[in-house]
C-alpha cells in the first residue's frame, strides 16, 4: 500500500511540470522562434530527467543539482533578471539522496507565488544546513484571487514520510519562505 501511495504522489509532479513549461514555451513561440527552439531543446533535457526518474524513489544530490541547473536555464530564459537563483555548489559533494524533482518543484513554487521584476528580483537560495538542503526565497506574495492548493508541498512531505519517515520543515516568516529537505543517507 505504501508503494502505491508513493507512485500516486510521484505522478502528481508530471502534469504540473509539463503544463507550466508548455505555457512558457507557447509565449516564447510568439515572441522569438529562435529562443523558443533553444528553450525546447533544454526543456527536452529537463523532461528526459523527469521521465527517467519517475520510477526512482531517490536520486543522488549531485544528479538533482545538475537537473536544477538545467531547469534554471529555462527559468532564466523566461524571467531574465527578475529571478536570482543562487545554488551552493558544494551541495554536489554531499553523499546523500533526495526524492527526484523536489528542488525544482520548490523553485517553481517560489516563482509562481511571488512577485518578481528586474527592479526587484525574487531571490531564491539553495544551500546546506546541517543534515538538510534548504530552499529559501523572498516572500512577496502575488495578490490574486486564487488560493494555493499546496499540492507541491503536500507532495514533497508525503514522499518523505513514505520514504524515510522524516518530515521536511516548512516555515513562513515575515519576509522569507523556507523549506528544509532532510538528506536521505545512502544505505
Language model region names:
Residues 1-182:
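Two-component histidine phosphotransfer core
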Amino acid at each position: 500500500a505504501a508503494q502505491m501511495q508513493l507512485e500516486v504522489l510521484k505522478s502528481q509532479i508530471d502534469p504540473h511540470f509539463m503544463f507550466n513549461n508548455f505555457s512558457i514555451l507557447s509565449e516564447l513561440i510568439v515572441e522569438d522562434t529562435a529562443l523558443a527552439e533553444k528553450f525546447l531543446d533544454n526543456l527536452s533535457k529537463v523532461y528526459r530527467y523527469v521521465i527517467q526518474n519517475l520510477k526512482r524513489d531517490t536520486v543522488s544530490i549531485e544528479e538533482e543539482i545538475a537537473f536544477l541547473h538545467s531547469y534554471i536555464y529555462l527559468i532564466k530564459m523566461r524571467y531574465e533578471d527578475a529571478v536570482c537563483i543562487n545554488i551552493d555548489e558544494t551541495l554536489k559533494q554531499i553523499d546523500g539522496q533526495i526524492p527526484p524533482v523536489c528542488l525544482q518543484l520548490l523553485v517553481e513554487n517560489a516563482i509562481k507565488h511571488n512577485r518578481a521584476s528586474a527592479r526587484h528580483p525574487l531571490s531564491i537560495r539553495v544551500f546546506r544546513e546541517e543534515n538538510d538542503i534548504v530552499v529559501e526565497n523572498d516572500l512577496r506574495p502575488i495578490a490574486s484571487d486564487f488560493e494555493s492548493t499546496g499540492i507541491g508541498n503536500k507532495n514533497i512531505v508525503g514522499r518523505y514520510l513514505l520514504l524515510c519517515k522524516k518530515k521536511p520543515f516548512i516555515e513562513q516568516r515575515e519576509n522569507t519562505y523556507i523549506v528544509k529537505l532532510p538528506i536521505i543517507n545512502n544505505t
